[in-house]
Amino acid sequence: MGAVELSNAQARRVALGAQGFNDRRPTGRVDRRHLRRVVDRMGLIQIDSVNVLVRSQELPLFARLGAHPRTLIDDATRHGDLFEFWVHEACHVPIELYPLQRWAMREHPRWTSLRSWADANERLVAGVLDRVRSDGPIVASDLEMRDRPKGTWWDWDDGKLALEHLFRTGDVAARRRPNDFARLYDLAERVIPADVRTAPAPAAHDAKKELLVRAARHH
């Protein structure tokens, strides 16, 4: 089959259709099954702190589902349908993709400065992991490690840095309270279903190839 030329308008319609905008909205009660169909169409749901109307991650659901319980994403995470991880950004991801992200947890490729900090603060990181093990789930403010006034932007203290490092390595996983942007950190074994967490993980090259194919399918 030869190359197919599309106008800009046609290409936009193809992309919007692939993302589920051609599908009918549900007419009855919206539940986790409807959320799952949306995620299967989109591939993932990006998380963002922007909060003009609601948190940005809620808007794609409203655009495709209309009125729905605002706890849908949290419910899906609690039931093991989704997990949170850094993909291109922080995202809610279908749980079956967890093995495809294990290479990123092993290699920690995008956050070299955070990895270097963790290497230089091994005892602190280990202590934070012990705290999560004994008291989790916790939020970063539970650690009370800030020794200076909070500055601009994120300005993470040592406790938050340790939690984020452990989150990226897969030692801890995250949930969120309904309508609350703060991450709740807990041991991965208490968040990720055991059969998913222990499933064979493909090599980095194979995982990246499969993720690329899936990304193309959603567009």
Where are the model-predicted features located?
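Long, low-complexity intrinsically disordered regions
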Residues: 1-219
